[in-house]
Amino acid sequence: MKIQKNAVNVLERTSAYLRAGLLTKQPAWYNVVASVPPLKKFERVPKLTNPSNDRINGQLHSLDSSAGNNGMFKTRYTAKDRSNASKQLYSASKLTYIEDQLREIFYKQHPWELSRPKILIENNGDEKYDWSHMQQIGKPLDGESVVQRTLYLMKNKEAPSLVLAYDMARYEFYRLRMQQHIEEQVAQEEAEMFGSVFGPSAIEYGIQKEQKVIDTWKRKAIIQTEIMAARRINPSESWATDEKDPKKNDDIEEDVEEIKL
């Protein structure tokens, strides 16, 4: 099948039309396409190695000396094995970074750090921080501070291994976080001393709402338990009591309305 290249040559054809006078006005996309021209290399180049870890792509796995589930030994590669290996040469390599591994470890060990509020600020990505110390101006203390501090210690060879560098950054993070908690607690106590009144926090408010639902459920459960016990003792009287005393049913309906509100 012949490769179609008309769309790729749109810049050259448009330039020729402008010079010949066929187009009197330059298109709005002309300068953009001229600064970033489309790729004209259509052949598929095999990716022999993964750039992130220098692992060889398309390499067949070694044959296992142990028997499989069916009790048979595999002594040679099948056509499917060779096909899967060749596909890896032309597929995009999965890039891995040490920063992602450090983030995964940190937030797995400290899941409550993810519950802290985040400020999403649109920036250009050119922010420069001095990671010779963890506390930064204009950046809150979080897990990313531990990651960047660990990389700084490794890059400047202040730690012999990645594990020790991570531990050093983590302990420094603990000290700063405890200092931050003490400062917030002292500031709150000083404000209360001068008459400030603080309402419930988000967690306390959620617990209060949850407790209301639990209390409502408890009252309904007690009423239903009494009804079931009465029916087991004397079924005929229990049905008559329910018809004569609608107060319990009204209480249940009020509880349901409270939950809906």
Curated annotation (Swiss-Prot):
InterPro entries hit by this protein: Ribosomal_mS23_fun
Keyword Transferase: no
Keywords annotated in UniProt: Mitochondrion, Ribonucleoprotein, Ribosomal protein
Ranges of Basic and acidic residues composition bias in the record: 241-250
Segments of this protein annotated with the region Disordered: 234-261
Listed GO MF terms: structural constituent of ribosome
Pfam families the UniProt entry points to: MRP-S25
GO cellular component: mitochondrial small ribosomal subunit
Subcellular location field: Mitochondrion
Compositional bias ranges of the Acidic residues kind: 251-261
Main location: mitochondrion
Family membership: Belongs to the mitochondrion-specific ribosomal protein mS23 family.
Name this protein carries in UniProt: Small ribosomal subunit protein mS23
Species: Vanderwaltozyma polyspora (strain ATCC 22028 / DSM 70294 / BCRC 21397 / CBS 2163 / NBRC 10782 / NRRL Y-8283 / UCD 57-17) (Kluyveromyces polysporus)
